[in-house]
């Protein structure tokens, strides 16, 4: 019988499952090398914690790791039901809030190691968390893709810790009672990008689609389709970072100015950035709340101990 101890939280409605104990030893390398070991040798642990019957397609997993740098508070590897994420904004907020809940960190700024670089996260007195993300940038502006049923769709390609295709002019109603249509549209766009060889830098896959609309309570509202075809309940930290990079590139948002990004369910992140040459360094602030603490059991007699794979 294998066991995995977890602590679940949600950030703006989007869940994070922090893995505390039970995964194999991944060595002492950096987070990217440990992610590679996990992916190539022990991926069944990811599947067990993310896939049904113990997980679902909305969950983002965060494996808590001992950091390489002794000054860092934690290392983390992010994953979901389809594979691995370079960075996760809402997940980092969830991680920091969870560490505070466990009494492992106090109010202040903490260094967090991720597979795509180190980030700074600040736990505030009001228990909100600010994440100073990895450098973000717009890779290409106004890229056209031919999408079945919808014709030409134009969007920007940007990096915010993951690769995004950001669409402002889409003709879709961005509302919580239109989720099926938004999902179908965004998924069709993603398939078209793949089919037409439209990628991020160095051929990296664009696995997030982000649609924007106006909002009465924020500067913008978004719908973000994640790699596993689930929509992000939060405003998406890496997606908001990609948005900030595009706004900065267009001269529509000055360094230090606040941008309020709402999600499809109305939760909000507050974002700003610093200019760093051709890149921007986004800071995303949000709140996370604990939702469950549990031990997962993987019984050797259970045919679905390592997840249901369809």
Curated annotation (Swiss-Prot):
Swiss-Prot/TrEMBL catalytic activity: trans-4-hydroxy-L-proline = cis-4-hydroxy-D-proline
Alphabetized GO MF terms: 4-hydroxyproline epimerase activity
EC identifiers of the protein: 5.1.1.8
Coiled-coil intervals, chain numbering: none
Active site residues of this protein: 88, 236
Keyword annotations: Isomerase
InterPro entries: Pro_racemase_fam (IPR008794)
Binding site residues for substrate: 89-90, 208, 232, 237-238
NCBIfam families, alphabetized: PRK13970.1
Role description: Catalyzes the epimerization of trans-4-hydroxy-L-proline (t4LHyp) to cis-4-hydroxy-D-proline (c4DHyp). Is likely involved in a degradation pathway that converts t4LHyp to alpha-ketoglutarate. Displays no proline racemase activity.
Annotated family: Belongs to the proline racemase family.
This protein's name: 4-hydroxyproline 2-epimerase
Species: Acinetobacter baumannii (strain ATCC 17978 / DSM 105126 / CIP 53.77 / LMG 1025 / NCDC KC755 / 5377)
